Amino acid sequence: MRILNHLILPILLLPALAQCQRNNGEGDFVKNNYDKQEVYIPMRDGIRLYTVIYAPKDKTTPHPVLMERTPYGSGPYGDSIYRRSLGPNRTLMHELYIFVYQDVRGRYMSEGQFQEMTPARNDPHNANKKPDASGKQTDESSDAWDTIDWLVRNVKGNNGRVGIYGISYPGFFASASLPDAHPALKCVSPQAPVTDEFIGDDANHNGAFFLLDNFDFDNFFDIPRPTPVKNYSGHLFHADYNDAYQFFLDLGPLKNANNPGYFNNKGKIWNEYMAGSTYTGYWEARNIRPHLKNVRPATLIVGGWFDAEDMFGSLRTYEAIEQQTPNNDNHIIMGPWTHGGWAGGNWTRFGILDFGQNVNDYYHQVETAFYNHYLLPTDSAGLPEAMIFETGTNKWKTYDTWPPKEATPLKLLLQPNSRLTSPSTASAYTPPSPETTASPGYDEYVSDPAHPVPYIDGIHSGRDNQYIVTDQRFAAQRSDVRAYQTGPLSADLTVTGRLRPDIWLSTTGSDADLIVKLIDVYPDTGSNPGYQRLVRAEVFRCKFRNSYEKPEALIPGQPAEIAFNMNEIAHCFRKGHRIMVQLQSSWFPLVDLNPQTFVNIPTANASDFQKATIRIWHDAAHPSGITLPVMQ
């Protein structure tokens, strides 16, 4: 989606602003070289979508069409007011594509009613323009089909070849163009696409609600739009806070967000989210992945290792196309970017991490080759299947498959005395204060909803996206966080692929959250001494351990196996570093509080929130650990 907070620019503005900044020296290039036209394109049900077309003045050769469909506005509006830059990068703008921007149904200047991630119909349905069995005529696939059909028939000087791209929410609309695609649609690039909002994107991760992001985002995105408008203004309510942790702690149970002064039941999408506390038909209908089969356009999936919103969407969209359309020309590129960071001109560092290069230079070469090959067309783009930036070494790697087949599983087991069984490349680990008594086969901590573990150290007024790489020493010092680590590695260890924790947990309550963090611990000497660099983290709401559709209470005192997949990494743990796993049961206010009782969290009362003693088991009967895909 999708994020708006008090510290960073809204993602919906990043591509335009970044391109504007890098094109400041080009003056009026767009106005001097393009004609602008604003039209309403009719859809099959009579609804008209507002569309802006920038066509090259040069008519000596036909030009391809590259389009973005967006809920964030296709402005600036007005025939005489031009964008300062066009398309996904400067090179393509200078190659004189026809660039098209469209307000999706029900947003800004388009007609119709907006739906959150419009559910896809059963394809094929586009060419015959007939309703499906339910009588429904349209979805985002049909709107893309009708738009493309109009463009190739009506825009003078086009070469009959169309591409679609989009970042974040526009990435969803790019993905939605793939089922039963128009024959003129030759390539699509879903970039950080919103894909499945219950399992891993934006709204929820494994059933746990991402409170901080959605509270801020829905506050502006949920503003009603009864008629077409050129500008949305304001918010549903005013919430000006300097300390997000304290603000949401004071807010109390999740249902209080609908109190007067906040959403007050005026947020349509917020209320839909609150009604969908399990993987109901609402969420399933908005999962685009089952529809990504028989894909005909070539695809370039783009994502960032530090994307706090939709990393899941990038990785799982690529995976869905590979599994359901194995012969499609499908590519993926993953770099050290935050959400949409590849759209700018310069990306050399993030937080304290210095990449030693502008990684966007490589990406823009890949992106340009992809579009030129399928839309001009040119000779083979020569793109590898997977182009992956390896953190730790700061190197681009290419693979024939993703994840690479060369990776082999290595399971690291939790041990007494805060130990993590060491790979062969690690020396034995001696804990700072070895226990002298026999291990009971578990470690335990008290999880208190009144004092949850913060997702990041310090005071922050909004979600700080650097939490995804931040130093975890602040958490390791807490009594409600358990940390396990190897000894120093005697050689580099490269982990490339998907992580799978398998943790045996028991509680005195009847529900719990489990947050698993994989951490690269730097040596005590050298640069960033002792830095506990977060490599990957994920939350799992334990009542969904057997089913997202039918949650089950935990039985107090009885160990339950919590096994799930985390997003991939491509990271080299360097010689002399340690591998650490941290476990905890809150991640606040990034994730809403689990009452630790088996209740419907969106309607839970303050009395439902209880302290619980969490035990992490690691005996022979309960071998807790995490499996890493290691490159040989």
PLM features per residue range, with description:
Residues 25-59, 485, 489-491:
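N-terminal cap/lid segment of alpha/beta-hydrolase-fold proteins
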Residues 82-85, 94, 116-130, 134-137, ...:
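Accessory cap/linker subdomain of secreted extracellular hydrolases
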Residues 156-168:
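Alpha/beta-hydrolase fold nucleophile elbow
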Residues 239, 246-255, 349-632:
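C-terminal, loop-rich substrate-recognition/catalytic regions characterized by aromatic stacking residues
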Residues 295, 301-303:
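Short beta-strand/loop motif that positions the catalytic acidic residue
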